[in-house]
Amino acid sequence: LIKAKQSPERITSRKIFAQIVKIGFPSALETALYNIAMTFIVRFMNQMDVDGMNVTARSYAIQIANFSYCVGAALAQANAIMTGWRIGAKEFEECNRGTRKAAIYGIITATCFSVTFAFAGHFIVHIFTDDTQMINLVVKLLIVDVFLEFGRVTNLVYGQALKTSGDAFFPVILGAIFMYLFAVGGTYFLGIHMGLLAVGSYIAMAGDECARAVGMVLRWKSGKWKSKGLVEV
């Protein structure tokens, strides 16, 4: 799909290694921050009840919603590969078109999946449990998940494109602010303080994903990534 010059020197080039670290380190840091945030969220959800119903409902909802996540992750990774090459070739308009198209396809597909799961939730959750109270709770989470997936797939596509372009620290900074302000703080406020429990936590996480998605799109549209390219072809 991509034609590029072969350069044996790149295999042992310290410059190339430094460029890899420049992208890889912020990405690893963002993942670490995300995992720590999820640890806080699970901690708060464990405080919502004594029988672990809210944490269990979250686990069921995540298993079902993972199908939507896979779509967004696949499109984000594929677009990131093409974006890296196009930036190296200075084909910035193609980067814009490709990233926008990947985001649109991802949003449509992920939304279709998540809406289907929300409508068919009562039937799907029966795979895991026959507890009516649990089923009703998971279905509520799947309804909120429609908005969560909308934000997440946008966040994934534009976030990966920014990282590939060399603008790797912006997603980390944005993620650190919104993950802990919206997802973690929102889980405590809505879930525990307001008494919305797992539904409140999901609303907070949906707010986090959508807020970060807006930030990623605005950063991409600013065009600052055009001056941060690391690869030449």
Walk through the language-model features, giving the residues of each:
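Alpha-helical membrane-inserting segments
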Residues: 33, 37, 41, 45, ...
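Small-residue-rich hydrophobic transmembrane alpha-helices
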Residues: 42, 55-121, 152-175
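Short runs within selected transmembrane alpha-helices of multi-pass transporters and secretion channels
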Residues: 72-76, 145-164, 170-182, 186, ...
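Transmembrane alpha-helix boundary and packing residues in multipass membrane permease domains
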Residues: 27, 31, 39, 43, ...
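Short alpha-helical transmembrane segments in multi-pass integral membrane proteins
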Residues: 1-25, 83-148, 190-233
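Hydrophobic faces of transmembrane alpha-helices in multi-pass small-molecule transporters and flippases
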Residues: 9-40, 63, 67, 71, ...
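Helix-terminus/linker motif at the lipid-water interface of multi-pass membrane proteins
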Residues: 32-63, 67, 85, 123-132, ...
